[in-house]
Amino acid sequence: MVDRPLKQRFVLDTSLFLTPEIRSGDEDLEAACLDLLDLISEAKLVHNISCYMPPSIQAELTTMLEDRAISDEVLTKLDTWVITKSPAHHEVRIPADLVYEFIDEMSERVDRGLRVSEKAVRKAEESRAETVEEHDHMTEVDKVISDLRDEYRDTLRQGVLDSREDFDLLILAQELDAGVVTEDQGIINWAEDFGLRYLKGRNFPPLLREYLAADDPDRWRDES
């Protein structure tokens, strides 16, 4: 058996478990989650690699898995092998420059959102009497409003921190000096600003397999 490497810590985002990128072939969500949690448990036992989630992320993920009728086995393994820890909100310090940057970015996004709204209003005014083909119950104005919601949401939220859960993830990672594992580009952008290590969710299972293969190459390189 090889010597254990320096202890590694990771803080996991909801997107890690839900992304299709961690699935093999025609593997479904439940099978992919079980495979991932098995890797996490083996990495903990063999190399003392610890995985964490803030309570807000754990609750969000549990709700999403339950909504998808995922078995209790997955939820039990999640509770067993992923440590739920509240971030130290009053102890972790955030540079003022990052706060100013966030304020400036959100102000710019609000301005862009207003332009999206103005464009939609003009379009609705031009076509309010028309109906949408194949949808007799939906007027062109309804269609414009529907498109507006999607475009406005993308303009304001894509690539930015947009929830307390995202912020909890970063604060906990900073507190623990841990790597962030996520598929969310907004979290990745801010992990860079915080000076945190991060990893795309799709690359996390291969990373754990490499750690495990260093100890048992015959088993883990065959399974990868």
From Swiss-Prot:
Entry keywords, A to Z: Endonuclease, Hydrolase, Nuclease, tRNA processing
Q: Name one Pfam family in it.
A: PIN_5
Statement: the UniProt record of this protein carries the keyword Ribonucleoprotein: no
| Enzyme Commission (EC) number | 3.1.26.5
Q: Which GO terms describe its molecular function?
A: ribonuclease P activity
| Reactions mediated catalytically | Endonucleolytic cleavage of RNA, removing 5'-extranucleotides from tRNA precursor
Presence of keyword Transmembrane helix: no
Family statement: Belongs to the HARP family.
User: What is the annotated role of this protein in its UniProt record?
Assistant: RNA-free RNase P that catalyzes the removal of the 5'-leader sequence from pre-tRNA to produce the mature 5'-terminus.
Q: Name it.
A: RNA-free ribonuclease P
Organism of origin is: Haloarcula marismortui (strain ATCC 43049 / DSM 3752 / JCM 8966 / VKM B-1809)
